[in-house]
Amino acid sequence: NNGYAYYGQNDAHGHDEVYAAEMVKEIAKKIYNSGQVDFSKYDNDNDMEIDFIYVIYAGKGENYTGADPYTIWPHQWFMETQLGNYWTGRYACSSELFIEEHTQQIDGIGTFCHEFSHILGLPDFYPTNASSGGSASTFREWSVMDYGCYDNYGFTPVGYTALERYSLGWMDVVEITSPGEYTLPAIDTAQIAYLLPSDEKLSYILLETHNKEGWYQYQPAEGLLITSVDYNRSVWKNNAVNNNLNEQRYKVIAADNDYSDFTKQGDLFPYNGNDSLTLYSAPKSITGCGIPINIPVKNIKYSNGVTTFSIIDRTETSVLQPNLVTDNGLSYSIWDNKIQLNSDTETKAVIYSVTGRIVESVTLQPGTPTNITLPEKGIYLLRYNNRVIKITN
């Protein structure tokens, strides 16, 4: 009933869902008044609520560079209105056209796949609140719930990750419980991924193989994609998975340990000689919320869509206790009057008593844990790299 600028206008908070929902309501009522649609076909669970409505609106969307700010940003939201005996609930929408450098063409399916995935229950994996997360996303092209929906201008959006498939009930993941040699074909052909559990039930690491074929052909690289998950129902429900830079609850563990937007080609294992993920590697086997997972993955190899790797018995490495603390390139853990130190670089570390007496002085080697026995329980000072921190046994 109105022009695009009416439905695309923003409210006081910068959101256009209120007016866009009005558009969807008007469309739904026009369809109902036509008398040509049997709404029971769209109520799969027979609860008298239409399961969802999807609208592709004419013209372009606000999500593309240089778009008119009065166009509608594609989104999923809620709109309740009665249509005879039925009610509406969730809806999603996206644009007809794709705009790039002053040209326009029919939009690809990428944005549709992203918004439809919201309807299915998946959250965004980019930070939805920039003020609290900044550039907290590590996914970009790796997930359709981030920038991956725009691969090949939206005509070849990236396929779903292991967590996305697992969350939707489309595949199971196999928990690794014992050391051995493992083979992992590409997720798109074998529908399999491995899970490394932690002592925290809802925190774990996922291993999945990606090759540059099919829906994955426009990814930056191929190999073993390793991600960490720290599931929290409330955070998922509120669509705030990666809004906290210090608690990224679903993140890529990048093989090159570089999380900038322009180094995605180095995210998958193996890369540039890095073929392992342990508590002492760089990057470390630690989730985005700081949960250590002491299941060493080594000898990662990738060839022709298949990854092989070794799971090493954790008793073959020094076990880092769950109270892991990481500080400026050094990690330490204290238990049973012992402290274990591990550094990313060769550095000298000195432990002092509170009276200034030297308890131990050692030179740490990268990747080699050092265990020190403390004389008694109490407070100590740890000095390294011209830093002094207090530790409590």
Feature names for model-found ranges:
Residues 51-53, 108-109, 143, 203-205, ...:
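Residue-level detector of short, conserved catalytic/binding motifs and their immediate flanks
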Residues 59, 211, 230, 313, ...:
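A mature extracytoplasmic/lumenal domain signature
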Residues 138, 217-220, 343:
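Short glycine/proline-enriched turns and hinge-like loops at secondary-structure junctions
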